[in-house]
């Protein structure tokens, strides 16, 4: 019988090395207010996801054209389906220039607010947490749910 793996935190890749950097603190505070994040862990999770995307794009850029071709198209299509890029034919350099806002814009909480279904970003979070938001007919209670592009227009409010 094997032992259980020690659980790892999923946000460590996005956690800053120097937590008490004043400029970073102000930037994080501004992002938390703009996107209605409850704590910095939510921001760090988004940064970790972005870091994974950038690392993958950088690895693809370092490959030769023959090695890159079969891997590049599915990677770009996945990013397009998730809504992180606006066109599946963008060059890899544009993927490297993504920032954390691209990830935060795809959160269910943000999309509910941007669609005008809630009065404020905090109201959107409350609607999601209390189970009033349906995505393609299914109740989603996680405000951090990353909405794929195909489900974006299937977000509804149930009162």
Swiss-Prot record:
Write out the GO cellular component annotations.
small ribosomal subunit
Q: Which UniProt keywords apply?
A: Ribonucleoprotein, Ribosomal protein, RNA-binding, rRNA-binding
PROSITE patterns, per database record: RIBOSOMAL_S4, S4
Establish whether keyword Lipid biosynthesis is in the entry.
no
Q: Does the keyword Ribonucleoprotein apply?
A: yes
SUPFAM superfamilies per UniProt: Alpha-L RNA-binding motif (SSF55174)
Q: Return the Pfam families for the record.
A: S4
Name the InterPro entries for this protein.
Answer: Ribosomal_uS4, Ribosomal_uS4_arc, Ribosomal_uS4_CS, Ribosomal_uS4_euk/arc, Ribosomal_uS4_N, S4_RNA-bd, S4_RNA-bd_sf
Query: Which HAMAP family does this chain map to?
Result: Ribosomal_uS4_A
**Stated role:** One of the primary rRNA binding proteins, it binds directly to 16S rRNA where it nucleates assembly of the body of the 30S subunit.
Q: How does it assemble?
A: Part of the 30S ribosomal subunit. Contacts protein S5. The interaction surface between S4 and S5 is involved in control of translational fidelity.
According to UniProt, the name of this protein is Small ribosomal subunit protein uS4
Query: From which organism does this entry originate?
Result: Pyrobaculum calidifontis (strain DSM 21063 / JCM 11548 / VA1)
Gene assigned in the entry:
rps4
């Amino acid at each position: 019988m094997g032992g259980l793996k020690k659980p790892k935190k999923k946000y460590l890749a996005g956690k800053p090395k120097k937590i008490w950097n004043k400029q970073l603190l102000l930037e994080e505070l501004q992002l938390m207010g703009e996107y209605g994040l409850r704590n910095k862990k939510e921001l760090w999770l988004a940064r970790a996801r972005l870091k994974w995307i950038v690392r993958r794009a950088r690895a693809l850029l370092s490959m030769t054209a023959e090695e890159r071709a079969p891997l590049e198209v599915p990677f770009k299509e996945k990013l397009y389906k998730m809504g992180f890029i606006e066109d599946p034919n963008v060059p890899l350099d544009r993927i490297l220039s993504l920032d954390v806002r691209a990830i935060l814009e795809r959160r269910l909480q943000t999309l509910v607010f941007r669609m005008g279904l809630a009065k404020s970003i905090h109201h959107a979070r409350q609607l999601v947490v209390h189970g009033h938001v349906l995505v393609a007919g299914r109740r989603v209670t996680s405000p951090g749910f990353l909405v794929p592009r195909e489900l974006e227009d299937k977000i509804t409010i149930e009162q």
